[in-house]
């Protein structure tokens, strides 16, 4: 098989990326029921630099503009005492010696606050964005990169993990956990559960108190019961082929996410054009 050497995202050492070949198809009990050939779309060039660029652009374009109120820190009646009093010439509340409103005073306005007019997004060429997505898709078929990203799974599994369409008919989370355990990937969900911690900084007061590691990426052909049964497990993302992008395939710009795909979803992905 053709081989190409590339640099890892977070390490100086080199890894060998091979051309993907045949993959096993697993049932809900983890048994191999057949083989399938990985689509040609998985054999595109692996470019970690473009993957990072694509993820950065996607995340930047998600940002919402923010700014303080235009009148923040200025809701006072103030005046200055002027010179000759032996005190600083700052604005003070009327009838009081308390300084106010100036940026250097407690409770005053900010000197140069963020503006809602500022464009926080980043531009990227369409072809470059597509190349980043396909490169991240290619990385999911490389066991070396998946392991380097920290995912835990049975050594005998072929990646990406292809499962029969019966997976989409699972009706409960309990059944989903049993299936993931049988296939040999539930250890990665446990890694996400054990890695849950309280976020450092102000974010924990703003609706994002906990930081949870990214675990399995589940790709289903359509909105289904199977997808709903696993999406509440820590670290798991459930998407359809149309919703795949570089950000979900390589969270944080680190390629090699552990991916579980139904047979129907794989057929849809195989129909993509480069």
Regions found by a protein language model. Name each.
Residues 28-213:
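Basic, glycine/proline-rich low-complexity segments that contact nucleic acids
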Residues 16, 153-156, 208-212, 231, ...:
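Solvent-exposed alpha-helices and their adjacent loops that cap or buttress functional pockets
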Residues 225-248:
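Nucleotide-binding motor/catalytic cores of P-loop/tubulin-like NTPases across gene-expression machines
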Residues 1-26, 32, 273-274:
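Intrinsically disordered, compositionally biased charged tails
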Residues 118-119, 183-186, 197, 204-208, ...:
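Phospho-regulatory, Ser/Thr- and acidic-rich intrinsically disordered linkers and terminal tails
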Residues 163-166, 219-222, 241, 261-262:
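Short His-Asn-centered micro-motif
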Residues 177-182, 231-236, 254-255, 274:
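Short, solvent-exposed amphipathic alpha-helical segments in soluble enzyme
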Residues 159-161, 215-218, 236-237, 257-259:
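Structural motif
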């Amino acid at each position: 098989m053709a081989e190409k050497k590339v640099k890892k995202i977070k390490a100086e050492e080199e890894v060998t990326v091979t051309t993907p070949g045949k993959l096993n198809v697993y049932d809900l009990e983890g048994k191999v029921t057949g083989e399938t050939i990985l689509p040609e779309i998985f054999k595109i060039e692996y470019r970690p630099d473009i993957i990072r660029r694509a993820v950065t652009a996607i995340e930047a374009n998600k940002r919402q503009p923010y700014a303080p109120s235009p009148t923040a820190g200025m809701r006072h009646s103030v005046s200055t005492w002027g010179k000759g009093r032996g005190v600083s010439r700052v604005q003070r509340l009327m009838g009081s010696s308390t300084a106010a409103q100036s940026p250097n005073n407690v409770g005053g306005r900010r000197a140069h606050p963020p503006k809602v007019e500022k464009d926080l997004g980043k531009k990227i060429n369409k072809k470059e964005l597509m190349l980043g997505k396909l490169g991240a898709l290619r990385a999911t078929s490389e066991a070396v990169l998946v392991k380097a990203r920290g995912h835990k799974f049975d050594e005998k599994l072929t990646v990406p993990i292809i499962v029969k369409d019966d997976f989409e008919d699972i009706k409960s989370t309990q059944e989903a956990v049993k299936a993931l355990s049988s296939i040999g990937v539930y250890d990665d969900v446990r890694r996400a559960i054990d890695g849950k911690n309280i976020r450092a900084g102000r974010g924990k007061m703003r609706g994002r108190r906990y930081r949870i590691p990214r675990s399995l990426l589940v790709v289903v052909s359509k909105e289904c019961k199977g997808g709903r049964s696993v999406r509440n497990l820590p670290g798991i993302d459930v998407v359809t082929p149309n919703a795949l992008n570089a950000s979900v395939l390589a969270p944080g710009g680190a390629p090699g996410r552990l991916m579980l795909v139904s047979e129907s979803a794989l057929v849809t992905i195989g129909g993509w054009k480069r």
